[in-house]
Amino acid sequence: AEAEVMISIDASPPDYLDHGATPNLIRMPAEGTRARWMTPSYPALTFPNHYTLVTGLRPDRHGIVHNTMTDAGIGGFRAADRNAVADGRWWGGEPIWVTAEKNGVRSASWAWPGSAASIGGVRPNRWKGFDDTVSPTQRIDDVIDWLDAPANVRPKLITVYLEQLDSAGHGHGRDSPQVRRTLGEIVPAIGH
């Protein structure tokens, strides 16, 4: 049986396909699928949008309304705070990996927002936490290892979060040489 792999290249608008360094992304729709368009949730920030993608709920319904927020009963939440992102009390709704696991379908996640927390007592069967020192190539190698596992332990649903393009864009500007170079590093990693 095949596996579903959902890869997010954070902050990658469709016109990045025109930068010329994306042959793997151009090839992928022929072998898999690609969204024709997306309407971001509001606010258009990483954590609210990524959790919306895996729950199907708007941020005001799943509770992750910003990358930084405060709740009088829980305290503060910052995307960079490992303890906060691992606290299941923040994460409402049911992400697809929880639904999969509840139905006997193994799942895995490489740093997808929400995957660090036990949600309803369930986490992905395999999981890697956010670590910006791990390259896109190593992350994809980990996914390949998951896919190469024996059938009885192989995940059938995998989510992978790649933040490098977003970081380069914030640091140097959307049309900077650094963004083009970062895109040129990420895309070959996905297709290797």
Identify the residue ranges that each predicted region occupies:
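Beta-strand elements within well-structured catalytic alpha/beta cores of enzymes
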Residues: 2-14, 27-29, 53, 100, ...
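His/Asp/Glu-rich, glycine-adjacent segments
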Residues: 57-185
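Short, structured active-site-proximal loop/turn typified by the sulfatase FGly-forming signature C/S-X-P-X-R
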Residues: 15-62
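Secreted, luminal/periplasmic, and some membrane-associated catalytic domains
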Residues: 36, 81-83, 192
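A fold-wide structural signal in alpha/beta-hydrolase
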Residues: 3-5, 34, 106
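Solvent-exposed, acidic/flexible segments
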Residues: 2-6, 14-22, 39-47, 86-93, ...
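Short, structured coil/loop segments at alpha-helix boundaries
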Residues: 22-26, 150, 176, 191
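Sparse, context-dependent recognition of short Cys/His-centered cofactor- or disulfide-binding micro-motifs
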Residues: 2, 10-13, 36-38, 49, ...
